[in-house]
Amino acid sequence: NLSSNGETSVTLTLQLEQGLSYDIAFWAQPEGLDCYNVSDLKAIKIDYTKCLANGTHRNVFYGNVFDLRTSQNDEVNVTLKNPFSKIEVLTTTEDVEAVSTLGYNLDNMKSCMKVKGIATSFNALYGMAEGEKANVSLIPSNIPTDIQTIKGKTYRLLASEYILGFSNQAIDVEVELSSENEQKSLSFFAGKAWAQHEQTFTLYDRYFTSSIEFDIKIDSEIN
């Protein structure tokens, strides 16, 4: 265990017996998280039922060194990377305004993703998702207020998750939104996202309402 005090780099000193070869796994996570069981870095267990949706609070990093042979005063540079795929779901700001007229105020609602077939275990030494595939739903939290511009249109972020998927795996993504007292709720299928380590996959559309234009003309003739 080593605290970085918020820094992005830290020095770790280990006392290793000379003349031997070592494979070493590294894992970094925020303090206070209980959704990761790191008793075995080659089989880190992820309990998604303890993971809060929509945030970077549970973001983690891993790294590895293979066949390290020690000599006096060795210094080894290790870069830690993110094992997750980040999935974002956005809808147009016009859609947000339209759905608010139906009584859905997104500023007072919570959201979470439901994803199917993702991994529940991670091998930090080899950087591989492992374990059985599981269908999971994270703990709902406040809908983000982030606004993004994509191809000239503005979109609001509805949900954002860090997902551990198997290599190049297509994942079905559903989004659930609910009010504090659960009197108002919405759910929809957002689409398929690709699970690739260290990559962000963005799903964007108009998910709540459709804009329909009627071309109306008056036929004044009377037969």
Regions found by a protein language model. Give the residues of each.
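Non-catalytic surface loops within mature trypsin-like serine protease
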Residues: 93, 205-207, 220
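Phox homology (PX) phosphoinositide-binding domain
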Residues: 196-210
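Tryptophan-paired
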Residues: 1-38, 96-195, 214-223
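Short, low-hydrophobicity acidic/polar segments
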Residues: 1-96
